[in-house]
């Protein structure tokens, strides 16, 4: 069985992202896979590339051939150089920022302004400047006022 390391496309129209997978060369692009060894998100800036290096090395060692696109990603991460026997392969991919560090406060916390310790929160009874519900506007005709 001829095994290939290739990209499986997932995502929306015009918003693709890929999984780097090991699959039989005769299967469809998005068909059944043997194993997923990584992810690639080209739309992000900078592009997100994550490859499980030990698993990629294993599949390369047993004869899996990468496609051109997968080979380019393996070269960027340094896995291809490691497979070819270089002593100190260098990854040109930036390490991803942790998700927790990039998150900000939830929307509910961002919307509410912090209240000072001595300051009271305004209530409905404190708002005497607003018209009450019982006030009838003067521009409403007489026949409509009586119906309400």
Swiss-Prot record:
Keywords, comma-separated and alphabetical: Ribonucleoprotein, Ribosomal protein
SUPFAM superfamilies xref list: Ribosomal protein S16 (SSF54565)
GO molecular function terms attached to this record: structural constituent of ribosome
UniProt superkingdom: Bacteria
InterPro entries xrefs: Ribosomal_bS16, Ribosomal_bS16_CS, Ribosomal_bS16_dom_sf
Chain positions covered by the region annotation Disordered: 89-148
GO BP annotation list: translation
KW Transcription (keyword) present: no
Gene Ontology CC annotations of this record: cytoplasm; small ribosomal subunit
NCBIfam families: PRK14520.1, S16
Family: Belongs to the bacterial ribosomal protein bS16 family.
Entries under HAMAP family matching the protein: Ribosomal_bS16 (MF_00385)
Full protein name: Small ribosomal subunit protein bS16
């Amino acid at each position: 069985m001829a095994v290939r390391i290739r990209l499986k496309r997932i995502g929306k129209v015009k918003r693709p992202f890929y999984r780097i997978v090991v699959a039989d060369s005769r299967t469809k692009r998005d068909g059944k896979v043997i194993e997923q060894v990584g992810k690639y998100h080209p739309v992000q800036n900078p592009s997100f590339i994550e490859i499980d290096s030990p698993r990629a090395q294993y599949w390369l060692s047993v004869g899996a051939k990468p496609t051109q696109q997968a080979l380019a990603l393996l070269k960027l991460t340094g896995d291809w150089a490691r497979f070819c026997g270089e002593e100190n392969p260098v990854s040109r991919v930036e390490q991803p920022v942790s998700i927790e560090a990039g998150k900000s406060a939830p929307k509910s916390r961002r919307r509410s302004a912090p209240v000072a310790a001595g300051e009271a929160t305004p209530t409905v009874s404190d708002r005497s400047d607003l018209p009450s519900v019982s006030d009838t506007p003067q521009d409403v005709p007489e026949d409509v006022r009586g119906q309400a």
